[in-house]
């Protein structure tokens, strides 16, 4: 705590504003908000997506001039939360940089102050090193390169797909967490720093994506705009995720599969560019092979068709509430 208090008392020329999206994880949220407000940030925006666990009441009890709380009337999902959160941060604080993360994540003590001390010349995006509370690397937040932009990585990824190790073809290795900084193409929204001017240039995160892939799509779009995105291993975040879903053959509830499939195609369209027509049939085949894991096969296949249609049309065909009703 003394180190945190020291960093909070220092004055920085660069204005950093944090954005947190929360939903029914009050105890985690308390840790995240406390960690941010102990740092030299110019502002904090919390978007609470309709929590019913006391989060809203706790947020209302806080008194800090740097805090702005947004209480949407309906659940906007992580993507929608970051969209309105980024917008509010830009309007309320006119920052130089934004940093975002979910309510079950938080910056390690001194992380945000350390970011403000970095040489950020020529950089528009940065990813922190994200760890589980036990100190191991958080796999879901491991930054990556886009294999479609790097021939060697594309070959490595294709070979890895044949052996079930495709992630290793384009995600950073453990050794990169011991280096100074690494240029990357994409990263998650846990400990993601974006220059405010870049946000104004490429636009806000796409709220209609709701969940899954919105962070990868956004950071890939940042890179496609010509901006530089780097991994900063010295800036540490902690992600206290409750579950690791790797290896699960079936996505439940079913509506989550819709977002995973549709947004996956949106992501591949951004990542693959001219290669997308070759990637599309491969992804569709993987969906068809997965049908054996779903008891309601007709409903699952209807979901696949809806996800394909929406991805190709580039617009949602129904509301989140309707999706939940169709695919419980």
Residue ranges of model-derived segments:
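A recurrent flexible, glycine/aromatic-enriched loop bordering the glycosyltransferase active site
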Residues: 167, 174-194
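A conserved acidic beta->alpha catalytic loop
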Residues: 35, 48-57, 74, 105
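Conserved donor nucleotide-binding strand/loop of the catalytic core
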Residues: 60-80, 88-92, 123
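A short, conserved alpha-helix in the catalytic core of glycosyltransferases
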Residues: 186-187, 191-194, 198-204, 208-235
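Short beta-strand-to-loop acidic/aromatic patch adjacent to the donor-nucleotide binding site
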Residues: 94-104
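Short, well-formed alpha-helical segments that are part of the catalytic scaffolds
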Residues: 25-38
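Conserved donor NDP-sugar-binding/catalytic core segment of glycosyltransferases
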Residues: 110-147
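Non-catalytic, C-terminal membrane-associated alpha-helical segments of glycosyltransferases
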Residues: 255-260, 273-328
């Amino acid at each position: 705590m003394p180190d945190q208090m020291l960093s909070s008392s220092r004055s920085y020329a660069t204005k950093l504003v944090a954005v947190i999206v929360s939903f029914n994880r009050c105890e985690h949220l308390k840790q995240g908000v406390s960690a941010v407000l102990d740092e030299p940030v110019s502002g904090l925006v919390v978007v609470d997506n309709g929590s019913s666990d006391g989060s809203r009441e706790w947020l209302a009890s806080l008194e800090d001039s740097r805090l702005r709380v947004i209480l949407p009337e309906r659940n906007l999902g992580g993507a929608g939360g970051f969209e309105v959160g980024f917008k509010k941060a830009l309007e309320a604080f006119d920052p130089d940089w934004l940093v975002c993360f979910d309510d079950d994540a938080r910056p390690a003590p001194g992380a945000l102050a350390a970011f403000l001390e970095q040489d950020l010349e020529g950089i528009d995006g940065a990813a922190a090193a994200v760890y589980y509370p036990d100190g191991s690397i958080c796999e879901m937040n491991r930054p990556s390169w886009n294999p479609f932009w790097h021939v060697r990585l594309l070959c490595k990824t294709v070979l890895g797909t044949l052996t079930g190790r495709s992630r290793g073809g384009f995600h950073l290795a453990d050794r990169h967490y011991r280096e100074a900084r690494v240029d990357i193409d994409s990263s998650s929204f846990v400990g993601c720093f974006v220059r405010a001017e870049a946000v104004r240039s490429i636009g806000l995160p796409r709220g209609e994506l709701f969940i899954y892939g919105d962070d990868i799509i956004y950071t890939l779009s940042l890179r496609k705009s010509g901006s530089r995105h780097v991994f900063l291993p010295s800036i540490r975040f902690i992600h206290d995720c409750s579950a690791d879903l790797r290896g699960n053959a079936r996505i439940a509830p079913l509506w989550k599969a819709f977002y995973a499939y549709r947004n996956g195609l949106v992501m591949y369209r951004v990542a693959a560019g001219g290669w997308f027509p070759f990637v599309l049939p491969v992804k569709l085949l993987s969906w068809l092979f997965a049908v054996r894991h779903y008891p309601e096969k007709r409903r699952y296949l209807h979901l696949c068709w809806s996800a394909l249609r929406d991805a190709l049309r580039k617009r949602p065909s129904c509301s989140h509430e309707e999706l939940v009703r169709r695919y419980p």
